[in-house]
A protein has these predicted regions:
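N-terminal signal-anchor transmembrane helix
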Residues: 29-83
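Loop-to-transmembrane boundary segments
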Residues: 66, 296-320, 423-458
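Catalytic donor-sugar/metal-binding loop of nucleotide-sugar-dependent glycosyltransferases
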Residues: 234, 243-262
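Juxtamembrane inter-helical linkers in multi-pass membrane proteins
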Residues: 384, 411-434
Length: 514
């Protein structure tokens, strides 16, 4: 007779697997829908007889390393000067403001309508800065660019014709990656982002589902922002929040997968974790705020279902952590499944195949498909990155699960910006020096938990290895050993990377005090 502990363990385990399998199935659906809608490329309704007024908004906070490069690119945009306004939305507390003022004076002398809107109070963070700037912006349309983006000269000539359709509220371009080849972390991030942009955003737009503004590299119709209720401060992903509100008002969005606006990726684990934490927590905040409203809205069922999947997908990180915890009783012998439950067949059919296929192969297929879209002639070069990609995805589970819990239970936090280092002629030493100007992650809890999980899976790997050496491994041993290798590598990578940064920060602070 199975014990109550075993019963609840099995029930929870299967529910977690079903949840993860559901999100894995959604990835497969994205690939299928892309094939179905790949030819539905959006086309502009017409051309402007006279170019409309556009305001370029550049929100920044302590971005002194990238502001000059950004303004060089913005002032090189091919658009009539008398139809272009540039707003630097600066909330900086360092010497970025003085640098911005120098740049404003320089470009004013060249005939640009440029100004720096400086706030001492960071109320609402980026959303607050955009809200204040919209009130004084001259343009009917707003091109928003984060400080690390480098727009091409034709960005407005390409995007503006789509606004000849009066129902279009937003034109979003695809993110590119300036430092894709910098290190292993940037290579893996670029693949993650390519999956989101090349597949998810493209499919959502071309199949008449809702997609969201990515916070930058897009052009808004200003009146649509006001119609949707404007920028609100109650989430840290104000772009996602506004996107759903505007689309539920009946406005249309356009996503240009073939037009790329390049940007800088975080080059260290601290920056990557901070960015992922903000995106994950913000998505859960929007889920709490908007999901009920979305289901009450008079929009197609497929749009409601896709929005639900989009807003809840980050709960998979919590499920992944729970799965790692649930594995422990089996590996330590606390759960001893009985023969009555036909454990061998269940493990083969449900546990092994489901976990391996939906949590591994679907992810592989999803990102390979994305790279085939982004780099059709060189996509095969990412094969050696697939296993590190899977490992990093698992390794980020603790960091992102923490963000899910904070978002779900309403914990507020500071808007932590992503480190941006810009181009440096002095090489890596200069980058390391610049990184000291950004806050390191001080909390040791997440990296310690990551290392604990990594140590547990290391012990499992050693056990499997010993069994194999003694010829005691069963027929599934090799597959389980491969599956458990991913969390072992992922948790150690994320945990050690963060711990090293924390130690460096402690040493730096000690040296300053001395």
């Amino acid at each position: 007779m199975i014990s109550w502990f075993d019963f609840f363990w099995l029930l929870t385990y299967f529910l977690v697997l079903i949840g993860l399998a559901g999100y894995g199935f959604h990835r497969l659906m994205m690939v299928v829908l892309y094939v179905k809608h790949r030819k539905n490329v959006p086309q502009p309704k017409g051309q402007w007889e006279e170019w409309p007024m556009v305001t370029v908004q550049l929100p920044m906070f302590n971005e002194k390393y990238v502001v000059e490069g950004l303004l060089r690119k913005v002032t090189a945009i091919d658009y009539p000067k008398d139809k272009l306004e540039i707003q630097i939305l600066d909330d900086s507390t360092d010497d970025t403001y003085e640098l911005c003022q120098q740049q404003v004076e320089f470009y004013k002398q060249q005939g640009f309508d440029i100004k720096c809107l400086h706030r001492v109070d960071r109320t609402g963070y980026k959303a607050g800065a955009l809200e204040a700037a919209d009130m004084v912006a001259k343009g009917e349309f707003l091109l928003i660019l984060d400080a690390d983006f480098r727009p091409e000269p034709d960005i407005l000539k390409v995007t503006m014709p789509y606004f000849t359709d009066e129902k279009v509220a937003l034109v979003q371009t695809r993110w590119g990656h300036l430092n894709r080849e910098k290190n292993m972390l940037t290579k893996l991030q670029s693949i993650f982002l390519d999956g989101h942009f090349a597949l998810e955003q493209t499919v959502r737009n071309r199949s008449d589902r809702f997609f969201t503004f990515n916070g930058t590299a897009g052009v808004w119709r200003k009146c649509a922002i006001f119609d949707g209720g404007g920028w609100e401060h109650d989430t840290i992903t104000e772009d996602m929040d506004l996107s759903y509100r505007v689309q539920m008002k009946g406005w249309n969005f356009v996503y240009l997968n073939d037009y790329v606006t390049p940007a800088e990726l975080p080059e260290d684990m601290d920056g990557f974790k901070a960015q992922q934490h903000r995106w994950t927590k913000g998505c859960i905040q929007v889920c709490r705020k908007m999901l009920t409203t979305i289901w009450k809205a008079k929009i197609p069922l497929k749009a409601k279902l896709e929005a639900t999947t989009h807003l809840t997908c980050n709960y998979s990180y919590l499920a992944l952590v729970l799965l790692c915890v649930l594995i422990m009783p089996v590996c330590t012998g606390m759960v001893q499944p009985s023969e009555e439950w036909a454990w061998t067949e269940l493990r083969m059919i449900v546990l092994t195949l489901t976990l391996f296929f939906f949590a591994t192969l679907t992810v592989c297929g999803f990102y390979i498909a994305a790279e085939m879209i982004v780099k059709p002639r060189r996509w095969w070069r990412i094969f050696y990155l697939i296993l590190p990609l899977l490992a990093l995805g698992v390794g980020m589970a603790v960091n992102n699960a923490k963000a899910v819990l904070e978002g779900a239970f309403g914990k507020s936090c500071e808007f932590v910006r992503t480190p941006k280092f810009g181009e440096s002629k002095e090489g890596q030493k200069s980058i390391e020096k610049r990184s000291q100007g950004y806050k390191a992650i001080k909390s040791i809890l997440v990296p310690v938990l990551e290392l604990c999980f990594g140590g547990f899976f290391l012990a499992i790997e050693i056990t499997f290895l010993m069994c194999a050496l003694n010829f005691n491994a069963d027929s599934f041993g090799a597959l389980w050993q491969f599956i458990f290798l991913l969390p072992f590598l992922g948790f150690f990578y994320t945990g050690l990377s963060s711990l090293c940064r924390i130690v460096e920060g402690m040493r730096s602070r000690s040296a300053k005090k001395a």
